[in-house]
Amino acid sequence: MRPPRSNTKAAFSSLQFGLLCLLLLVNNGIKSVQADAFTDYFSDYDCNQPLMERAVLTATSSLTERGPDKARLNGNAAWTPVENTYNHFLTLDLGDPRMVRKIATMGRMHTDEFVTEYIVQYSDDGEFWRSYVNPTSEPQMFKGNSDGNSIHYNVFEVPIIAQWVRINPTRWHDRISMRVELYGCDYISENLYFNGTGLVRYDLRREPITSTKESIRFRFKTAFANGVMMYSRGTQGDYYALQLKDNKMVLNLDLGSRVMTSLSVGSLLDDNVWHDVVISRNQRDIIFSVDRVIVRGRIQGEFTRLNLNRELYLGGVPNVQEGLIVQQNFSGCLENIYFNSTNFIRVMKDSTELGEGYLFTRVNTIYACPSPPIYPVTFTTRSSFVRLKGYENSQRLNVSFYFRTYEETGVMLHHDFYSGGYLKVFLEFGKVKIDLKVKDKARIILDNYDDQFNDGKWHSFVISIEKNRLILNIDQRPMTTTKSMQVATGAQYYIAGGKDKNGFVGCMRLISVDGNYKLPQDWVKGEEVCCGDDVVVDACQMIDRCNPNPCQHKGLCHQNSREFFCDCGHTGYAGAVCHTSNNPLSCLALKNVQHVQQRVNLNLDVDGSGPLEPFPVTCEFYSDGRVITTLSHSQEHTTTVDGFQEPGSFEQSIMYDANQLQIEALLNRSHSCWQRLSYSCRSSRLFNSPSEAGNFRPFSWWISRHNQPMDYWAGALPGSRKCECGILGKCHDPTKWCNCDSNSLEWMEDGGDIREKEYLPVRAVKFGDTGTPLDEKMGRYTLGPLRCEGDDLFSNVVTFRIADASINLPPFDMGHSGDIYLEFRTTQENSVIFHATGPTDYIKLSLNGGNKLQFQYQAGSGPLGVNVGTSYHLNDNNWHTVSVERNRKEARLVVDGSIKAEVREPPGPVRALHLTSDLVIGATTEYRDGYVGCIRALLLNGKMVDLKEYSKRGLYGISTGCVGRCESNPCLNNGTCIERYDGYSCDCRWSAFKGPICADEIGVNLRSSSIIRYEFEGSFRSTIAENIRVGFTTTIPKGFLLGFSSNLTGEYLTIQISNSGHLRCVFDFGFERQEIIFPKKHFGLGQYHDMHFMRKNGGSTVVLKVDNYEPVEYNFDIKASADAQFNNIQYMYIGKNESMTDGFVGCVSRVQFDDIYPLKLMFQQNPPKNVKSLGTQLTEDFCGVEPVTHPPIEIETRPPPLVDEEKLRKAYNEVDSVLLACLLVILFLLLILMFFLIGRYLHRHKGDYLTHEDQGADGADDPDDAVLHSTTGHQVRKRTEIFI
C-alpha cells in the first residue's frame, strides 16, 4: 500500500541534515556492560536478536568433546583448542550478511578456564578478514570474562556488517575456553552502483537545507583511488564536498566564511572492500570517521549554519565545482546512504511511485552492486611469487600489471630470454629500475624515473621490448630506450620474485603477459603459485601503519610491510614516535641540568610530551639564584599615538611569541609574573580621574588575557581606577589619580608593573584623547615583554621518610603510548620508585645498587625491561632526572637528560598497557621495597601532579618539601651527618668525639708519670692559623696539658695550668716569646672545662675561648719583616714532655689540632705508630662527661587500608546471610536433638515390668524378715490405739 504523500514529504524533509543520535555514541570505541545492565542499551526493536541459532561454527583446532559446536552461549560445555597459543580462531558463519551489534562471552562452566581478552574479525567471503579496530586504527582488544560462569557483553558502537565473524583469543586464564553469542538483526542493503560516468542529482531548490546539525552515514566499496562521492553548494558560498583522493577520504566544507576546512581520514580505501563512513556536525564541531578511525575537527570561520539551496550530487558532478580536488566521478558502490535517519536510496526508489521522481535525476547508475572483474593478489613474503607462461621464442615481449607496496626494494618481474640473457624489473630505494642483459651485449641498468613508487598507491606498469627498442610506461608516462638488441622470449615469467630471494612484497592486479590475462582464481597452486598461503588471491592485504599518523607532534611517518618509522628531525621531539621533548621544561629546568650563561635564548616546552608546542623565550640567570623567563611580543618598541581623539579609538593588538594555551601554562607554573606598561603624555588624558565606579569613562585602557577591559593602570590595584601615583599619593596634580589626567602641556608619564597573573598578559591597548595630528596633544606608550620568575614544578616536592610510605595516584592510563617524568634525590641503594599493576600488566621503576635504574613492564606478552647504568652514584643525595616512555615501538629510559637506553617491542600487534591499580609512588602496590628520599616535578603525559597537595592530607610517612633527618644538624662536634631520610648516621671522622651523634667523649685519665706523644709524619707542618682544642678536669691546679714543639726551629706552644689554678698559654712562633693567662676562672676545682686556642689575622691575633665565656682576643704587634708562622712542628705532647718529671694529673679529652685528633687515633683499633703512650699503660675514659642525646625518632604506624563501604556492606551482607542460614540449621538440629532426648527420658522404662519389692530387703535371712524390712512392706497397716 502506498503511504500518504505527507509522510513522504516528511521523509524528504528529514534529508535536511539533522543530528544522527547513533553517531554521538562514537567517541571511544567500545562500551563494556554487564549482563544485568544490557537491556538498558538495546531493546528487541533496536536490533538485538540472537544470531547464532542456525550459525555454522568452526575452529582451528579443538579437544575431544570440546569442539566448536560446544561454543554456544547456553551450552553446558565450551570450545577449547588443543594448545593455548595466540593463533586459534573460532569462526561463526551466520549464513547471510547480518548487522552485529553486540557479543556475549562465557568461559567453561564451573571451572577457571575462560578468555580474558580477544580480537574480533569479520569477512564478507570467509577468506579476507579485517579486524575490528579502535579509533587509532589498532585492532581493538575486547575485554573478556573474569570467571567461567558469568556472561560479559561488549557493544559494537559501529555495528559489524558481515556474514562471517571470528574470534581470536589473546589472553586467557588456565586454558582457552569460550562460549559465545552474537546479537543483532538481518541486514537489508540498498545499493547504488556508479560506473565512473554516472551521478545522482537531487533538487534542493524546492526544499533547501538550512541546518546547524547534520549527520551522514553510509558504506562504500571501490577499486579506484579517486572519485567524487557527494557534493552540494549554496548561493551564499556554502559547500559540502566529500571525495576520494589517493585512496583516502577527504571532506572539504565551508559554512559561508570563504575559508575552507579540510579533514582527511582512512587509507587504502580502494581495496574493493566495504568501508563504513560516518560524518556528524554540531555547529562548528565535526566528527569524521571511516572504519571506526575517528578524526575530530573544528570548522573555520564564524558561521555555524549550513545553507544548501542548489543541487545535491552523489557519485559525481557534471562540471568542476568549488571545494573539489579530484576531477573523476566515483566508480563503485554506495550502500544505505542515511541522511539523519532517512535512507536516501530507499526514498529515491519510492519517489517514482509516489510522484516525486522529478526531484531525482539518475545518470548511468543501477540499484545493485556488481563485483568488478578486478582481483588483486598479495605477495606477503619475499620468497613468494607467481610463474606465468608466455609465448616462447617470440620477437616481442609485453608485460603489464598494477602494483602497490611500501617496500623500498624487491624484484617485480624476472624473465630469462630464450636467446640468452634476462630481463629483471626491480625496486631500489623506491625507484623502478630495469636490469637488461641481451645475448652478446653488455648488461645495462635503466633508471628512467626520479619518482619513488613505494607510497602505497596503485601504479600502472607496462614494459614492451621489440627489436632495438624498449618502452617502459609507469603511470601513463612512457620512456623509450633505443639500443641495438634482438630478443627471443622464453616460456616462463616470474612475477614478484622466483629467481631472487629479495622478492616483491605488496599487491598486484591485472597481471597480463603477452596480452593474455588469466584470472588469479584459475592459477594452479604448486605449478603457477609458489609457497602456498604466502600468495593471497582476491585480496590486497596491506596495512597502512601511517594512518592515522602514529608519529606525534607532527612527525613524518614512513613504513615498510612490517613496521613504521618516524622522522622527528624538524619537530623538536625525540624517540621512536617523537614523544619526548628535546627542549627544557623551563629556564630553571635548564639550570638544574647544565651550566648556563647569564642570558640564553632557547625554546621552552612547558608541558614536556604534552600537546603544547615549544616556543621561544629568553632565560636570564642571576648570581643570587633568581631565574627569569622573558616572553617577547611584536610591539615592544615605543609607539606614538596621535590623531585619535575618541576614547579607545586607537587600538593595538599584541602578538606574542606563544599562543594563549602556552602562555597560560607558563603563567600557571611561575611563582610570579609581571609586565611593564607605561604611557607618556602631553596634554593627553589617560583616565577621567577622579571618578566613581559607575561614572568611570576612561580615554585609554588595556585589555586582559580574557579580553576584559581593565579599570586600573599598571602599578595600581584592580578596581582602583587609578595609576601608580594615585595609589602612592604622588601625582603631579594632587586632585587627580594619574599624572596624565592633569592635562599638562609638559610631558608626563604613568607607568608601572602589572603583577596580577590572572589578567596577564596584555592582549591589546586602546588610547584616545590624542587630538588631531595638527594640535599639541600626543601620547607614547611602551609595553614590555612578559617576565616570569620561578617554576612551581620544582617547588612541588615531597619527602618519603618511611620505607613503606607511598602516594597513591589514580590509575594511570598509559595505553599504547605514555610517559612519566620525575626528579628524585635519595641515599638509598635499592628501592622501587613507582609501581602499578593490572590483571596481567604492570609497570615498575626501581633503583638498583645505587647506580642503575631499571624500568620493567608487561603488556600482554612476557615481561620486558630497560636498564640505564651510570658511572656515578644516583644515590648521592643530589637531584637526578628520569624520563620513562613506552610507545608502540619501544620503551625508553632517559636519566639526567643524556644517558639513554631502549628496548624494542616484540613483533606483532602492540598491546595497550591495561593498568587497574593505583599508580603507587614510593613503593610497590604491596607497599614493599619502599623508597625513601625526595621526589619532585612529577609529570604524567606532560601534566603536573600536585604531590604537595597529597602530602598536605597528612599521608603516612610523607612530608612537604625535601626535608631530611640531617636538616636539624643532629651530629654534634663537627660530625658529618649522613642522610638516610628514614634516619641518619654520623661520621665522626673529623671530630674528637665518637658515638651515634659524635657526642661521646674520648679521653684519658693521666697520672703524674703519663705522657702521650704524637709525631707529625712526612713533611713538617707549618701553620699561620691554628685551631686547637682541649678539654680537661683536675683537682690539682698545676701541670702541662698540651704542647707543640719543633727541635728544628726551637718554636713551641704550651697550654698548662699554673700553680694558681689559672690557664696559661706560652708560645714562641719566631717573633718573640708570648704568655697569655686566662685569669677569670680557677681551673683546679674538679669541674670540666673546654678550651679553644685559635690564631687569625696572619698570626697576629690569638683568640682564647673557655667554656661558655666570651672569647678573648689578644693582639700582638708583629713587624712586617717578622715571621709569625709556627714552622716545622714535629711533636705534640699531652700530659707532659720528656724533659718534665711531673705531669698533669687529671682527665684530658677533646684534643684537637686542626684536623688531627691524637686521642681518637691512639684508642682506635690498630692505632698508627706515630701516636703512643711513653709512660704507663693508659685506658680510654669519658672524663665524667655524660654524652648528649636526642629524643628518639617518633615511630609512625601505617594506618589501616581504606575499605570500600559498599563492598564491605555487600560482603557483610553475604556473610550475614550465610551465618544466619548456618545458625538456623544448627538451631533446628539442636531442637531435634532436644526433643529426642526428652522423649527418650520419658520412655526409658517402656516395655519392662518393674517393682520395688526387693528394695530394703536385699540382705534378709528369710522371707518373713524380707517382708518386714522391705521398703514397700507387706501393705498391712499397723493399728494404733489412742486414748483421749
From Swiss-Prot:
Glycans are attached at residues 195, 329, 340, 398, 668, 974, 1047, 1137. Residues 1239-1284 are cytoplasmic. It is a single-pass type I membrane protein. It is found in: Cell membrane; Cell junction, Septate junction. CDD domains: EGF_CA, FA58C, LamG. Residues 1-35 form the signal peptide. Residues 36-1217 are extracellular. GO terms for biological process: axon ensheathment; cell adhesion involved in heart morphogenesis; cell-cell junction organization; dorsal closure; establishment of glial blood-brain barrier; heart process; nerve maturation; presynaptic membrane assembly. Residues 542-579, 962-999 form the EGF-like domain. InterPro entries: ConA-like_dom_sf, EGF-like_dom, FA58C, Galactose-bd-like_sf, Laminin_G, Neurexin-like, Neurexin-related_CASP. Found in septate junctions of epithelial and glial cells. Disulfide bonds join 47-185, 333-369, 507-540, 546-557, 551-566, 568-578, 934-962, 966-977, 971-986, 988-998, 1147-1183. GO terms for cellular component: plasma membrane; pleated septate junction; presynaptic active zone; synapse. Gene3D superfamilies: 2.60.120.1000, 2.60.120.200, Galactose-binding domain-like, Laminin. Keywords: Cell adhesion, Cell junction, Cell membrane, Disulfide bond, EGF-like domain, Glycoprotein, Membrane, Repeat, Signal, Transmembrane, Transmembrane helix. The chain crosses the membrane at residues 1218-1238. Pfam families: EGF, F5_F8_type_C, Laminin_G_2. The keyword tRNA-binding does not apply. The keyword tRNA-binding does not apply. PANTHER family: NEUREXIN-4 (PTHR15036:SF91), PIKACHURIN-LIKE PROTEIN (PTHR15036). Seems to play a role in the formation and function of septate junctions. Septate junctions, which are the equivalent of vertebrates tight junctions, are characterized by regular arrays of transverse structures that span the intermembrane space and form a physical barrier to diffusion. Required for the blood-brain barrier formation. Forms a complex with Nrg and Cont. Forms a complex composed of septa junction proteins Nrx-IV/Nrx, Tsf2/MTf, Cont and Nrg during late embryogenesis. The C-terminal region interacts with coracle. Interacts with Patj in cis form. This is Neurexin-4. It comes from Drosophila melanogaster (Fruit fly).
